[in-house]
A protein has these predicted regions:
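Divalent cation-coordinating acidic motifs and surrounding scaffolds
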Residues: 1-185
Length: 185
């Protein structure tokens, strides 16, 4: 898709690009040096995440239209339910998601990237997502994506608590369709 920027069919380049499946910052640095993208003067916001495959999310933005003022990576901390429960080691986040205190049962996945800034003169908040995959079966991994959705909702709620009229864009690879319950919440 990025290679089609600047073609007659797609003469307008995006101002903001949420990227998933990013190996490291060097990949992004190489990408923005491509001739068609170099003309856009793109900035990069990227953090290494704890994902077991070593992939991250990032935001590319045209510097002439968007000025970031703050950014942070927000970890999605989820655990498998395979270790036997012990009352002292388990906390219930809600009725379906159980959080264990031990790291040996943690599912290491991508963080959610929160970027705030000004799109021209309007303050905007962008959340770049790459929710856990369906690898291992849709049903078996559904709770992981639901936890990602709940984290995303908490980020949005916290921004709206500060400013009820906040402009928020959440984007990325949700590994679910628009009708799945994780997306609709």
């Amino acid at each position: 898709v990025l290679s089609e920027i600047g073609t007659p069919e797609n003469s307008n380049a995006p101002t903001l690009i949420g990227a998933a499946e990013i190996e490291n910052r060097d990949v992004l640095e190489d990408l923005i040096k491509e001739p068609k993208l170099q003309l856009l003067d793109l900035g990069i916001i990227h953090f290494d995440s704890p994902d077991k495959r070593g992939i991250d999310v990032a935001l590319l933005y045209q510097k002439k239209y968007f000025r970031p003022t703050s950014y942070s990576n927000i970890p999605l901390i989820i655990y498998k339910k395979e270790i036997p429960k012990k009352e002292k080691e388990t906390e219930v986040l809600d009725e379906d998601i159980e959080v264990k205190k031990e790291d040996n049962n943690r599912v290491f996945t991508r963080d959610q990237l929160l970027v705030s800034g000004f799109l021209e003169d309007e303050e905007i908040h962008i959340i770049v997502n790459h929710w856990p995959s369906r690898s291992g079966g849709e049903k078996a991994t559904s709770l992981f994506r639901e936890a990602a959705g709940k984290l995303n909702r908490r980020i949005i709620d916290s921004l709206q608590q500060i400013n009820p009229k906040a402009k928020i864009l959440t984007m990325g690879d949700f590994n679910d369709g628009p009708l799945n319950k994780k997306i609709g919440r």
